Amino acid sequence: MTSIGQLRSQVASKERSAVEVARQYLERAERLDTEVHAFLRLTPERALAAAEAVDAKIARGEDPGLLAGVPVAVKDNLCMVGIPTTCASKILENYRPPYESTVTRRLEEQGALIIGKTNLDEFAMGSSTENSAFGPTRNPWDLGRVPGGSSGGSAAAVAACEAVASLGSDTGGSIRQPASFCGVVGLKPTYGLVSRYGLIAFASSLDQIGPFTRTVEDAALVLQAIAGHDPLDSTSLAVNVPDYRQALISDLKGVKVGFVKEFFAEGLDPDVADAVFEAIEVMRDLGAQIQEVSCPRFARGLSTYYIIATSEASANLARYDGVKYGLRDREADALVPMYGRTREEGFGSEVKRRIMLGTYALSAGYYDAYYLKAQKVRTLIKQDYLDAFAKVDVLVGPTAPTTAFAFGDKVSDPLSMYLSDIYTIPLNLAGVAGASIPCGFDAKGLPIGFQIMANALEEGKLLRAAYAYEQATEWHKRTPALAAEALTR
């Protein structure tokens, strides 16, 4: 699979035109997606127009951008002017945004070719992409298994080589967990480093946009393109974005690495544990100083998250009432029944479940007992991570307790599904950075993810650790059979 750097070089040197690249990937995505269903729609007109603009810049001798000629897919909760943006929900099935998300604008300013919008769990609520109103995405490594979620389509598109990179959103693990399940790199940046303007909100204090790629270097390049302050997002951090490529060093001499002991307790699959411990030993061989670190309030993370996230979701999703945009029930004879029937028809069962949980947590008489208490525990969880990062440069552990599970295995057991994110959720509560990189395969031949975590705005440390590990191993070079076959055509 061609990397971002290689592809940009080929396009910039006129070895290949950006238009040629766009057509190649659009054709491949159309062919492979009959099996994978990573995309909800392809955007050929937009991609080809962007490709023509890149080729024109090169012909004029201008800098075509950091991502010139690179086919990128974006999760379908990121707004693009005039292109249906559904959040994989019937309530937004025909919604065409009148404005552009900051991240898609920045991608195209750097020469990226946005080839399509990817599938997700409805409103990014789920861990398997089974909650999409438009059908599930399949894991390219085993079409009978889930790709993870909620950004399952974005992860599967990169794993299947339908796109060189993609964007997802991560509220409690929705980039890192599918990256683990699909055997790709997934990066959740520090909260506020990447603008959320144009991201349709799930839980506003937790949501963050980040890239999926096949290599750590490619993730650094995409992050470079999309990071930075945005006056359109009041939560965007006013910080200078460093050159993340300078962090890509292939040794870990002097780097302090802490493994979180609470991540290795009951519930962790033995194959996953073995692969992660082997990855830690590789880091030791690269010169890292390894030590055990404790995050004592780890066990409170899941319940804290599901109070805060659902509370914010119930408020954010109150706007979908059939009045201004989206689905509207046409049979109701009064306003209040129209509200109810619109939401009943438009929302799926998991979204309704989370709205009800959040509404309950915010209701009079329960606000202090649930929501306010959860916010206090969130502060304590954040302090756990601050204390840990005072001792080490990065933390490591498994991304998910298991590898990809079969379709239907957890649908009837929401708690079991929620536990898929038990190792990723605390980072969103703390607002720090995390990434999942491939570190092996289980006995069934399914990918295993290795989670590397760094303090807020220390993506450079995270990328250095991830890059050094990646360069010492071969896991990122493995490709699913269906993608390998497509690449030979």
Curated annotation (Swiss-Prot):
Enzyme class: ligase
Chain segments annotated as transmembrane: none
Gene Ontology MF: a single term: glutaminyl-tRNA synthase (glutamine-hydrolyzing) activity
KW Nucleotide-binding (keyword) present: yes
A matching Pfam family: Amidase
UniProt GO BP: translation
Catalytic function, reaction form: L-glutamyl-tRNA(Gln) + L-glutamine + ATP + H2O = L-glutaminyl-tRNA(Gln) + L-glutamate + ADP + phosphate + H(+)
Enzyme Commission identifier(s): 6.3.5.7
Taxonomy, superkingdom: Bacteria
Keywords, alphabetical: ATP-binding, Ligase, Nucleotide-binding, Protein biosynthesis
Record's GO cellular component terms: glutamyl-tRNA(Gln) amidotransferase complex
InterPro entries listed in its UniProt record: Amidase (IPR000120), Amidase_CS (IPR020556), Amidase_dom (IPR023631), AS_sf (IPR036928), GatA (IPR004412)
Active site: K75 (charge relay system), S150 (charge relay system), S174 (acyl-ester intermediate)
Family as reported in the entry's similarity comment: Belongs to the amidase family. GatA subfamily.
Function: Allows the formation of correctly charged Gln-tRNA(Gln) through the transamidation of misacylated Glu-tRNA(Gln) in organisms which lack glutaminyl-tRNA synthetase. The reaction takes place in the presence of glutamine and ATP through an activated gamma-phospho-Glu-tRNA(Gln).
Record text on subunit structure and interactions: Heterotrimer of A, B and C subunits.
NCBIfam families in the cross-refs: gatA
HAMAP family noted in UniProt: GatA
Protein name stated in the entry: Glutamyl-tRNA(Gln) amidotransferase subunit A
Species the sequence originates in: Gloeobacter violaceus (strain ATCC 29082 / PCC 7421)
